[in-house]
Each structure stands twice: as structure tokens, then as C-alpha cells.
């Protein structure tokens, strides 16, 4: 993708790259989603993105769930609760090198989660319990030791737990097909 979303990095490193689109300035969530859709349509093997949970949500919103696109996040946000991030940029580079050499072939679904503010629009204070919400799952390379584990906040919010259980059953109807849920 053009500009600050990839092309500038390749250019500064002296690496040629095919640029299939360009972001607005400054970049936005919409630019991320447009880039993901365009790249996904080319049937890429791996989509690397840089950011935090908000960017992971943008990727999730744009990736075609039926293409099984494999993604890997490079942690660059202020909070990463999702399980789709490498533990470091070096770990991400090792995963990419392994994929290029054919040594890593498995993939696994990992959750995309994000902070849920107690008050809409509020930021996290150091005295506040952090609650997160599950937004879905993305395919990531199965690379034990290279991926961050999903982080879970301390205190459960019963309404969020109920919402997540209901969402899980709605997303996986084969689990209860032909059975009564009480």
C-alpha cells in the first residue's frame, strides 16, 4: 500500500514493491480497511500490519472471512489485548522468514479484542479495571513462542460475559444445531 502504509519503508530500504493503492493523509481506519480489502483480493499468503487492537479490529472488519487470509500484527499500539500480534518486530521477521522458507505452514484462529471504556470516549486511568470485548477471530501463523498471548482484564463484567457467550453461539450454530439452549 502506498505512502506511510508500506511503500515508503520499502523505498527507503531500496526494495521494489508493487503499490496497489494509496492512503489519504493523515491515514485513517478507512485506509486500513481499503488496503486490507485490496490486498486480500490479490490472494496474498500473509498480511502484515502495524498497530494495536484498533488496527486489528480494522483488519478484521475488512478481511474476507471466506478467504482464510493469514495475518500477523506487529505491536505498535499502546495496548494489545488481541492474540494476533507477534511478541516483537524481530519475532514477526522470524515468522515471515520461516514462512518464506516453508518451515511454518500451520495456522490458527486467534481472538481480536479491544478495550471497552467504562464511559464512551473515555481513556483508561491507572486505577480503573480494564475490560475488553471479543470482536472476532483472525487466522495467524501457528508459531509458538513468537505470538503474544491474548490478555484478559481482571474483573469480569457479567453483561459482557453474557454478550460474548451469546455471540459465540450465534457465530457457531453447528454447536447447538438440533439442540435446545436454556
Task: Kindly give the residue locations of the regions a language model identified.
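Gly/Ser/Thr-rich loops at beta-strand to alpha-helix junctions
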Residues: 2-7, 49-57, 78-79, 180-182
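Residues on a specific face of well-ordered alpha-helices
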Residues: 57, 90-94
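Proline-centered loop/turn at the N-terminus of a beta-strand
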Residues: 46, 69-70, 180
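A glycine-rich beta-strand to alpha-helix segment
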Residues: 35-38, 44-61
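Short, acidic/small-residue loops that bind anionic groups at enzyme active sites
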Residues: 50, 63-88
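ATP/NTP phosphate-donor binding region
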Residues: 1-44, 93-175
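Short Gly/Thr/Asp-enriched flexible loops that form oxyanion-binding sites at enzyme active sites
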Residues: 9-11, 54-69
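Short helix-terminating capping/connector loops at secondary-structure junctions
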Residues: 67, 174-177
Amino acid at each position: 500500500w502506498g505512502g506511510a502504509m508500506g511503500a515508503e519503508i520499502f523505498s527507503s530500504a531500496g526494495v521494489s514493491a508493487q503499490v496497489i493503492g494509496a492512503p489519504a493523509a493523515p491515514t485513517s481506519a478507512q485506509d486500513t480497511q481499503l488496503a486490507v480489502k485490496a490486498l486480500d483480493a490479490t490472494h496474498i499468503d500473509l498480511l502484515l500490519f502495524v498497530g494495536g487492537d484498533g488496527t486489528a479490529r480494522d483488519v478484521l472488519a475488512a478481511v474476507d472471512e471466506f478467504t482464510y487470509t493469514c495475518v500477523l500484527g506487529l505491536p505498535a499500539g499502546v495496548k494489545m489485548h488481541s492474540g494476533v500480534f507477534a511478541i516483537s518486530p524481530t519475532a514477526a521477521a522470524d515468522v515471515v522468514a520461516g514462512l518464506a522458507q516453508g518451515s511454518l505452514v500451520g495456522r490458527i484462529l486467534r481472538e481480536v479484542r479491544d478495550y471497552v471504556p467504562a464511559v464512551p470516549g473515555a481513556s483508561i486511568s491507572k486505577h480503573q479495571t480494564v475490560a475488553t470485548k471479543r470482536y472476532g477471530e483472525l487466522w495467524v501463523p501457528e508459531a509458538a513462542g513468537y505470538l503474544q498471548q491474548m490478555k484478559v482484564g481482571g474483573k469480569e463484567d457479567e453483561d459482557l460475559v453474557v454478550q460474548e457467550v451469546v455471540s459465540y453461539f450465534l457465530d457457531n450454530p453447528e454447536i447447538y444445531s438440533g439442540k435446545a439452549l436454556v
